[in-house]
Regions:
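Alpha-helical scaffold segments
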Residues: 1-165
């Protein structure tokens, strides 16, 4: 994916951000948010999918349980970059109050990340506001894509998992 994404369309970045297995793809997610070429919409989606609403309950790093501090740090850095204009503006949008990705429930697209967590309202307005642009949910992914990856890339990943076992 690191070879694929730099030349991929902007919506591919967002599809991966919204459909990826964050437990298994943490290194790639981290790589994505370190790239100034990452579309704003993908960065904002990663912010919310990474638990920004949950971590909003903590005012300082010291309040965060030890085992979660690294994730808190990642979210703080991502928030600072996003609000500072680090990411690339594109025609792809993302609305954290109306995410067209159904979060595993095809019958309920339109998830509200801000209302979904009681502490999310305390986050800065800039990360709660919709980014203008086409709202590409996972339902718009090309047929055959798995976890936000083209079939041929997913096949390589699956083979690597099998080889490790």
């Amino acid at each position: 994916m690191i070879e694929f994404l730099p030349n991929a369309p902007d919506d591919a970045w967002l599809w991966f951000a919204c459909d990826s297995n964050y437990d298994g793809n943490g290194q790639l997610i981290k790589w994505m948010i370190e790239q100034p070429t990452c579309p704003e919409a993908a960065a904002l989606a990663i912010y919310w999918y990474s638990g920004a609403g949950f971590y909003a309950q903590y005012q300082t790093r010291e309040q965060v349980p030890d085992h979660s501090r690294d994730q808190f740090d990642v979210l703080q850095s991502l928030q600072q970059r996003f609000l500072g204009g680090f990411y690339r503006k594109t025609a792809v949008g993302f609305d954290p109050r109306n995410d067209p990705t159904p979060i595993g429930i095809l019958e309920r697209p339109g998830y509200d990340w801000v209302a979904g967590e009681p502490h999310a309202e305390s986050l800065p307005a800039g990360v709660k506001n919709a980014l203008a642009g086409t709202q590409f949910g996972v339902m718009n992914m090309p047929e055959g894509w798995v976890e936000g990856m083209p079939l041929e890339i997913n096949a390589v990943v699956e083979q690597e998992y099998e080889d490790e076992e």
